[in-house]
């Protein structure tokens, strides 16, 4: 599996240092709310720079056509695009209208990127920085060498590591709930190694396509590490990631991370897995997850009980756990979505010790 280099840590340090410009306006634990989305936007800006003129020309030709989204993606050679005349560098030419121009620039991104920014709730930060007179200053930092995130400078894999490091620092600054969306990389690597250990089809086959699902994907660490590890073993294999996340910000981070690395983010969905399953009726080759433990499911009670009436026609045919045991519902979700073993299905769930004890007790009852 690929390892990090000093270059990655240095770049992450440089990007995080931009937060110095936020001092006084934001508290230290709020820096990530600005740095994360801005880093995503800047990376997209750099990625699209090489095809910017081609996209603008194509937009003039197809802006009134119903198929324009497909044509613009083709012009950008990416899964996203921007039809604004602005780039970060061009925004610097007009400091007096930075807020207006920056908003216009963001609004011209494709819908998948706008969805990420909406989930980041970034619009309010634009207003705050503009009102406090630091918006231009902060954006300008991203046009210096420290903010150079062009693919010629930083590969997709390196950018993924840099983004991961910024996420880690952000999680530490929110240490009261960091565990909800950050699973240590070494834990994920161990799980992934076990998951693929004896799967000869995916390890040695040519042009094999498999699916992987995480019902509580958080920032997408498990899905990303699984893809990265598999490609290091067999570059011809395609692993399509499916995930759902309830928290808006962690969903935005996950979807952004997928796009940053050049992966397909279409199947990363937001919403409550227990009450609003975005992949109802679907099954997957692999399931890898670290669902939240100690979480009550009383808020989802009505929807869960309604689905339980379907028996094994739904996810909860084995019966419902105690109201305090939401993790068991995630476990049943994973089991219901696993392909049969004879069709290659495999799963791995990271659970708390208390959950295993609870399972033992339930087996005695059942």
Describe every region a protein language model picked out.
Residues 19-20, 148, 172-178, 212, ...:
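Glycine- and acidic
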Residues 48, 230, 234, 338:
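Active-site catalytic pocket residues across diverse enzymes, especially alpha/beta-hydrolases
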Residues 293-296, 300, 306-324:
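Conserved catalytic motifs of ABC-family nucleotide-binding domains
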Residues 10-17, 39, 157, 161, ...:
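Generic recognition of stable, solvent-exposed alpha-helical segments in well-folded globular domains
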Residues 1-199, 267-278:
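Non-catalytic, mostly N-terminal accessory regions of nucleic-acid modification and defense proteins
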Residues 181-289, 294-306, 351-353, 364:
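Conserved S-adenosyl-L-methionine
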